[in-house]
């Protein structure tokens, strides 16, 4: 959008923050964004530790990757990861691909949700108070608390699903201006999103 030329989607936040990111998602995918949250690596580690860590099923390659960078002795299988270990897991790309990395990131978020939803209302409010300083957002504190209060009654029964964009058969690989990129089939992606999400 605006003065910017075609580029990787993940460049939009660096170029223009939340405003450009939201405009780009809306223009390309027809999705209206209600609010944004951003956490840096330091904040990510701190939030994970505040939640109490997360349970993640690791492959042998993932366990070896975490061990190499954290001087730990984790083995394949179900592991309880602290903030530093969870960050290493979420950032891992060289053991497979970008698609593998984004899948790990989704697993981290879902596991964190599973961990947090078992907290009491008092514990959740205390957690929110402690982690807000690590979050950059265009939502007000009152909007965040309002969303939290709306979520609390549903937390024990709500089911969260994730969806990857671009989906299979909705892109092709190319080299553009020296960048290795996935070129999206935007009409097909919009169609898939309309089938998956209740878009307005």
Give names to the regions the model predicted.
Residues 1-200:
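Non-catalytic, solvent-exposed segments at the cell envelope interface
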